[in-house]
Swiss-Prot record:
The lineage of its organism: Eukaryota, Metazoa, Chordata, Craniata, Vertebrata. It comes from Homo sapiens (Human). It is a multi-pass membrane protein. Residues 1-27, 78-101, 163-198, 261-275 are extracellular. This is Olfactory receptor 51I1. Odorant receptor.
């Protein structure tokens, strides 16, 4: 379908329905989302502040944790504008180009999260398998290079996404059954040949999530082998405890991702509310849970929090 200027038709705005079956503008729904955002933002800002001010946390593990916290803030802020406007102000229209920008940032931050979790697994691998070389292997320059590499890889991989979407005509309406813009939802209202989009999306998922998760599993296989060599059970438990926070963070991220991918690929007839709720889980739960997981499971973080409050009271 062509517009008046001879270019493929694209709606000026897209309408976001929020969660199908739940009316937008309801106070209790808005309150839930505000609480989720508050927990995520306050929790991740607290992690960043704690690592910055506490000298005992100036170690590779906590630098990677800071990257994770910063990325989780990016995930939260990339969805916040449309979610808040939809549920708090009952305004559910977003400009088409703004929707593409939001889609790009949501997917980019999600891919960066996967890369950071891989870097954190490598950190645990070096710490447990080569403890005497830990500081010399993971220097500040290498950590910075890893962070920039994750950013560059995610940005360049996702950069073509808005353009391969924008080339399509949109003639199936302008309604997205979501509270933010995602690539699969845009494909449902697009016309024309979407094979390029689907193939590119699948390759990107395999190249990013597939490879990252494979290397994370490989890292933990090598860690497990190293732990079995340790004679002392106390040392084994200590080594395992240093990995528990990261394992929980990996599960909180990858389990919803796998569930969403399976639903989109193999259960396309699922009610819209199922797709929306699962997408909300994978975008809202990890940024909210990660600060809690590391605060509960990491002794040094707990000590840092107590020390910070003691200083504040003094």
């Amino acid at each position: 379908m062509l517009g008046l200027n001879g270019t493929p038709f694209q709606p000026a705005t897209l309408q976001l329905t929020g969660i199908p079956g739940i009316q937008t503008g309801l106070t209790w729904v808005a309150l839930i989302f505000c609480i989720l955002y508050m927990i995520s933002i306050v929790g991740n800002l607290s992690i960043l502040t704690l690592v910055f001010w506490e000298p005992a946390l100036h170690q590779p593990m906590y630098y990677f944790l800071s990257m994770l916290a910063l990325n989780d803030l990016g995930v939260s802020f990339s969805t916040l504008p449309t979610v808040i406007s939809t549920f708090c102000f009952n305004y559910n229209h977003v400009a088409f180009n703004a929707c593409l920008v939001q889609m790009f940032f949501i997917h980019t931050f999600s891919f960066m999260e996967s890369g950071i979790l891989l870097a954190m697994s490598l950190d645990r691998f070096v710490a447990i398998c080569y403890p005497l070389r830990y500081v010399t292997v993971l220097t500040h320059n290498r950590i910075l290079a890893m962070g920039l590499g994750i950013l560059t890889k995610s940005f360049t991989t996702l950069f073509p996404f808005p353009f391969v979407v924008k080339r399509l005509p949109f003639c199936k309406g302008n309604v997205l059954h979501h509270s933010y813009c995602l690539h699969p939802d845009l494909m449902k209202v697009a016309c024309g040949d979407i094979h390029v989009n689907n193939i590119y999306g699948l390759l990107v998922i395999i190249f990013t999530y597939g490879m990252d998760s494979t290397f994370i599993l490989l890292s933990y296989a090598l860690i497990l082998r190293a732990m079995l060599v340790i004679i002392s059970q106390e040392q084994r438990l200590k080594a395992l405890n240093t990995c528990m926070s990261h394992i929980c963070a990996v599960l909180a991220f990858y389990v919803p991702i796998i569930a969403v991918s399976m639903i989109h690929r193999f259960w396309k007839s699922a009610p819209p509310v199922v797709h929306v709720m699962m997408s909300n889980v994978y975008l809202f739960v990890p940024p909210m849970l990660n600060p809690i997981i590391y605060s509960v499971k990491t002794k040094e973080i707990r000590k840092g929090i107590l020390k910070f409050f003691h200083k504040s009271q003094a």
